[in-house]
């Protein structure tokens, strides 16, 4: 019932995004959950970093790539019975700990299976799952990926910065300059460990430079009220939005 109320409340031009591991029973259950939703981003991911390949999965590159390919095929399988519009998003989790050539290879393999179009591009999300470097290094990685993707016009290059080094906003802005098209973040930076990049902070920064962030940032007091009531967390009194 909650799901139905939620879907009825979502404007038609807003996409619901669901995050799923590349595991069939989770993908199947997710498609059952989103029935009735008109526009959905199916976001699949798997770990790709050198450390996770060796320590967590004990798999080589080809085996890790096959997980992503199989996950993409499963999404295509279950979307056949779905009435709404689907856009695929894929994340090589722990991108910042992954060799760039392998990150590119696995994304290209997913794209080959999915066959995106200019009208319905695939989203490749390149997360700083752990912020491991200075912002300029992350921006260099984003630029390299943007330059080396094939069919770049069929790709939305997304970033997902965490804030382990306290540089999430700087990393986001430099990544946008380096070729990123989209940012994933959270309200007031709320996220695991030291949090994710604050989307409102990014929006205010863009607005101050004469760029329309395409977010309604005028009603921030109500946003704060809902946030604090739902999370039981307070906005820092020195935050410029408080």
Positions of PLM-derived features:
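Short beta-strand segments
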Residues: 19, 43-47, 160
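Short, small-residue-biased leader/transition segments that mark boundaries at the very start
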Residues: 1-6
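Alpha/beta enzyme core
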Residues: 9, 24-155, 173, 177-178
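Active-site cofactor/substrate anionic-group-binding motifs, chiefly glycine-
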Residues: 13-20
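A mid-to-C-terminal "edge-of-domain" accessory segment
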Residues: 210-241
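Short glycine/serine/threonine-rich phosphate/pyrophosphate-binding segments
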Residues: 26, 164-170
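C-terminal helical cap(s) of enzyme catalytic domains, especially alpha/beta-barrels
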Residues: 191-216
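Glycine-rich phosphate-binding active-site loops on the catalytic face of alpha/beta enzymes
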Residues: 178-195
């Amino acid at each position: 019932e909650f799901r139905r109320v939620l879907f009825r409340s979502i404007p038609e031009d807003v996409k619901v995004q669901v995050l799923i591991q590349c595991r069939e029973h989770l993908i199947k259950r997710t498609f059952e959950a989103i029935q009735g939703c008109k526009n959905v981003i199916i976001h699949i991911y798997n770990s790709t970093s050198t450390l996770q390949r060796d320590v967590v999965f004990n798999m080589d590159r080809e085996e890790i790539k096959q997980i992503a390919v199989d996950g993409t095929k499963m999404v295509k399988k279950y979307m056949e019975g779905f009435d709404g519009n689907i856009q695929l998003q894929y994340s090589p989790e722990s991108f910042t700990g992954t060799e760039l050539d392998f990150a590119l290879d696995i994304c290209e393999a997913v794209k080959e299976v999915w066959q995106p179009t200019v009208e319905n591009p695939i989203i490749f999300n390149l997360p700083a799952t752990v912020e491991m470097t200075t912002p300029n290094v992350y921006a260099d990685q984003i630029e390299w990926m943007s330059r080396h993707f094939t069919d770049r016009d069929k790709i939305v290059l997304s970033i997902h910065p965490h804030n382990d080094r306290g540089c999430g906003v700087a990393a986001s802005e430099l990544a946008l300059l380096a070729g990123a098209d989209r940012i994933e973040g959270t309200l007031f930076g709320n996220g695991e460990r030291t949090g994710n990049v604050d989307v409102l902070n990014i929006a205010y920064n863009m607005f101050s430079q004469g760029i329309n962030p395409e977010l309604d940032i005028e009603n921030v007091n109500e946003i704060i009220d809902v946030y604090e009531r739902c999370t039981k967390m307070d906005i820092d009194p020195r935050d410029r939005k408080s």
